[in-house]
């Protein structure tokens, strides 16, 4: 972990922005150690350009670093957003921004949101210039996919003051989006017209909802005016979600499924690695790996005892570096070695494994030897592209913590 932290600090030295603050509070500029970037330009949101011209929000990169280094106080202080309450963070840039007097219309493509996800927190982050005047604004939010029918999500009033510190303004839109998640509609194929959703939204008792746009103010998909104070690069919706327990892990976007469906995977490079074959979820894949050497303990027949050894996974070597932003490599560890007969508590055997070792001692031809396997695993937080969006997700059972015999 110390090595990973050091790598992250070097990687983020020139591309970081301050920690987020609670909605309706002006952000304080708090760059990471070694940062030399003044974050007051919308263009900085693009991050470093990849050779395939991909972009990622710097906010997502810092959120990833905060989680890995344990500096997650910014989220822990927010209501209902303890670190353990979410396992996925999805960032969505606005697809379109339009303006009609003091009414702003923001459109997002939420097709990447899984039906099995439960919304924990939704933040609308808007980058405003220092010269932005103070006046009341009504913001209408829509889901729009490929310029097709528009799904009205909700509206709220905002009065963003002139900012003297960070130009970022953060709004908590969780209550506005919760009905959309609870409907459990297939957003890839089912769309409601803006007028229908607006009429339904206006009747909600939620204080964060305001009256729906009137007939003369309804969203016009052909409207071309762009707000003076923002553009799509400076408007981002950040969704903190958790897979519902009722989903029973069916359809959960595992790393294997994400890799198989990613358009950024280097198939040609991966095909050159010998011996690659597919496994079930939660099992390590047989990729090109670098194994470190650890001093061995020996038993009577000369074989080392069951122990944990290094297994460095380098995503560049397996053709995954194009879609995985961080980490570029990590130590997954693995288990190898012999299990003594009979077993003892040092190797954390189950009762069944212990009895199996006893039978093996007295009847060696009857059963096979216990196997050296992982008995404790830990998750790995990963920042990567899922389709055209950037996702921060905690993948379970990615690192071997302890080995034992079973």
UniProtKB/Swiss-Prot annotation:
Write out the entry's keywords from A to Z: Cleavage on pair of basic residues, Cytokine, Developmental protein, Disulfide bond, Glycoprotein, Growth factor, Secreted, Signal
Q: What InterPro entries does the annotation carry?
A: Cystine-knot_cytokine (IPR029034), TGF-b_C (IPR001839), TGF-b_propeptide (IPR001111), TGF-beta-rel (IPR015615), TGFb_CS (IPR017948)
Sites carrying a glycan are: 71, 136, 172, 344
**GO cellular component assignments:** extracellular region; extracellular space
Cellular compartments annotated: Secreted
The disulfides recorded in the entry are 306-372, 335-403, 339-405
List the Gene Ontology MF annotations in alphabetical order. cytokine activity; growth factor activity; morphogen activity
Q: Where is this region: Disordered?
A: 195-222
Q: Which residues form the propeptide?
A: 19-281
Database matches in Gene3D superfamilies? 2.60.120.970, Cystine-knot cytokines (2.10.90.10)
The secretion signal range is 1-18
Q: Which domain of life is it from?
A: Eukaryota
Q: Which Pfam families match?
A: TGF_beta, TGFb_propeptide
What does the entry say induces or represses the expression of this protein? By dorsal mesoderm-inducing signals including smad2-smad4, activin and other nodal-related proteins including nodal2/nr-2 and nodal4/nr-4. Shows autoinduction by nodal/nr-1. Induced by vegt, acting in an autoregulatory loop. Beta-catenin potentiates the response to activin. Not induced by wnt8 alone, but wnt8 potentiates the response to activin. Suppressed by ventral inducers such as bmp4.
Tissue specificity remark: In the first phase of expression, localized to the vegetal region of the blastula. During gastrulation (stage 10.5), this expression disappears and instead becomes localized to the dorsal marginal zone, with enrichment in the organizer. During the second phase of expression in neurulae and tailbud embryos, expression restarts firstly in two symmetric patches near the posterior end of the notochord, and then in a large asymmetrical domain in the left lateral plate mesoderm.
Report the SMART domains cross-referenced here: TGFB
What is any one GO biological process for this UniProt entry?
A: left/right axis specification
Q: Extract the CDD domains matched here.
A: TGF_beta_NODAL
Q: Summarize subunit and interaction data from the UniProt record for this chain.
A: Homodimer; disulfide-linked. Interacts with, and is inhibited by cer1 and gdf10/bmp3b.
UniProt function note: Cooperation and regulatory loops of multiple nodals are essential for mesendoderm patterning in early embryos. Essential for mesoderm formation and axial patterning during embryonic development. Activates the activin-like signaling pathway to induce dorsal and ventral mesoderm in animal cap ectoderm. In addition, also dorsalizes ventral marginal zone (VMZ) tissues during gastrulation. Acts in a downstream signaling cascade via cripto and cer1 to mediate cardiogenesis in embryonic mesoderm.
The family note in this entry says: Belongs to the TGF-beta family.
Q: What is this protein called?
A: Nodal homolog
Q: Which organism is it from?
A: Xenopus laevis
Protein's gene: nodal
